């Protein structure tokens, strides 16, 4: 991905007017403004910032859309949070034993935004409610005067002057808001239920992902093959979330936002046991939230006047 990509767009108030998106690598904030119409215009100024951490196995792709509306008495910013969170699923021998193999896997993916700026307030976000569907598609729309609304799907943006959409896949997982107030929002994308060869299993089932090869020396063989694992366990998760904030005009020139991507990891132990007749089998034992908040947090500084984005820190 290109770093520090900057896109500047002026949006007419005409419904769903097409956007021009010139890509300017390493450019500065746009210096000129084009007014369209008779003073009832909305200007959308776009910035994009990419940050990757090999340590945490996370890439953040954050789109910052500044909404400059002459009929709205506040600054507004739409943050679209995309990227990739690796599953970091791992198989290993438990404490060097020969009869216990372990699988560490993501029970939950974490996505969050927070600010401590007293002049900034969270005014909208997507998704809002608990969502169990495999495919998630929603739209945030903006109408002149500071009116933000959400639509249930990508096709529901016909009545907006400007819109921003999210779309992601969460097979066998559910999305829900864990925390939300005027300064922050935190989502959890959590394991739900899984179709297995022995039937439907809860995400809390102690035998979930336990395999059928008790005589193998390879830890991987104690668990089901990749073909039976959903993408969010086998590879990772591609988030697509939106938060909208307002800022008091004439107050601070800059605000800081902390954006967090990460995961909570469960550990499933597959234990080799023997029956009374000497037959071997695998018995599952589960440790829920064995590793919590394995998160990558980046602090971004937003300049409300120049519309520049700076990375101020990361863990």
Curated annotation (Swiss-Prot):
Q: Name one GO biological process term.
A: cytolysis in another organism
Query: A Gene Ontology molecular-function term?
Result: toxin activity
Q: Name one GO cellular component term.
A: extracellular region
The alphabetized UniProt keywords are: Cytolysis, Hemolysis, Signal, Toxin, Virulence
- Taxonomic superkingdom: Bacteria
One Pfam family it belongs to: Leukocidin
The signal peptide annotation in the UniProt record is 1-29
Cited function: Toxin that seems to act by forming pores in the membrane of the cell. Has a hemolytic and a leucotoxic activity.
Could you describe the subunit structure of this protein? Toxicity requires sequential binding and synergistic association of a class S and a class F component which form heterooligomeric complexes. HlgC (class S) associates with HlgB (class F) thus forming an CB toxin.
Into which family does the record put it? Belongs to the aerolysin family.
What is the name of this protein? Gamma-hemolysin component C
| Origin species | Staphylococcus aureus (strain MRSA252)
């Amino acid at each position: 991905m290109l770093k520090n990509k900057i896109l500047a767009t002026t949006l007419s108030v005409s419904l769903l007017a097409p956007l021009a998106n010139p890509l300017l690598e390493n450019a500065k904030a746009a210096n000129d403004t084009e007014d369209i119409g008779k003073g009832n215009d909305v200007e959308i100024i776009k910035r994009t910032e990419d940050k990757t951490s090999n340590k945490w196995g996370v890439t953040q792709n954050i789109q910052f859309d500044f909404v400059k509306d002459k009929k709205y008495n506040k600054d507004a910013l739409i943050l679209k949070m995309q990227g990739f969170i690796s599953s970091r699923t791992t198989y290993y021998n438990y404490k060097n034993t020969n009869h216990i193999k372990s699988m560490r896997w993501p029970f939950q993916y974490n996505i969050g935004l927070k600010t401590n700026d007293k002049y900034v307030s969270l005014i909208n976000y997507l998704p809002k409610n608990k969502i169990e569907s495999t495919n998630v598609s929603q739209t945030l729309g903006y109408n002149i005067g500071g009116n933000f609304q959400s639509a249930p799907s990508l096709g529901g943006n016909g009545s907006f002057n400007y819109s921003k959409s999210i779309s992601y896949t969460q097979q066998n997982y559910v999305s829900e808001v864990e925390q939300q107030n005027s300064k922050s929002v935190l989502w959890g994308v959590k394991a739900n239920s899984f179709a297995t060869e022995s039937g439907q299993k809860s995400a809390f089932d102690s035998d979930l992902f336990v395999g059928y090869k008790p005589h193998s020396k390879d830890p991987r063989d104690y668990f089901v093959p990749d073909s039976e694992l959903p993408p969010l366990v086998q590879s990772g998760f591609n988030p697509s979330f939106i938060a909208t904030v307002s800022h008091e005009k004439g107050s601070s020139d800059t605000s800081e936002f902390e954006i967090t991507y990460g995961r909570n990891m469960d550990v499933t132990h597959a234990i080799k046991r023997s029956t009374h007749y000497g037959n071997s089998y695998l018995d599952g034992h589960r440790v829920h939230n064995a590793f919590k908040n394995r998160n990558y947090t980046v602090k971004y500084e937003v300049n409300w006047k120049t519309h520049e984005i700076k990375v101020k820190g990361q863990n």
